[in-house]
Amino acid sequence: MNQERIYKVLLGPHVSEKASLAAERGQVVFRVAPDATKPEIKKAVEQLFNVTVEGVQVLNRKGKLKRTIRGFGKRNDIRKAYVKLAEGQDIDFLDVE
């Protein structure tokens, strides 16, 4: 996988209550590209953050229909990846090069 693709796979960390609970279990949640595969996500996290990834779980969330003044609008679909890190490893997002 080339260096350009690595930066396009991970869109950023996903911050929520559920992500905070997952962090206590050694998982980190990322928003990823819609066409990203599990092996690509694993390789990107390992190369960018210098950690060992034990597993990747991916989910697709469909965007909700929301009513607006001008009718209906649709929120964007997102793809999230729950990345399980090896025992004792952690990612510090503030200390990334």
Swiss-Prot record:
The keyword Amino-acid biosynthesis does not apply. One of its GO terms (biological process) is translation. The keyword Ribonucleoprotein applies. Transmembrane segments: none annotated. InterPro entries: Nucleotide-bd_a/b_plait_sf, Ribosomal_uL23-like, Ribosomal_uL23/eL15/eS24_sf, Ribosomal_uL23_CS. GO terms for cellular component: ribonucleoprotein complex; ribosome. Keywords: Ribonucleoprotein, Ribosomal protein, RNA-binding, rRNA-binding. GO terms for molecular function: rRNA binding; structural constituent of ribosome. Belongs to the universal ribosomal protein uL23 family. Part of the 50S ribosomal subunit. Contacts protein L29, and trigger factor when it is bound to the ribosome. One of the early assembly proteins it binds 23S rRNA. One of the proteins that surrounds the polypeptide exit tunnel on the outside of the ribosome. Forms the main docking site for trigger factor binding to the ribosome. This is Large ribosomal subunit protein uL23.
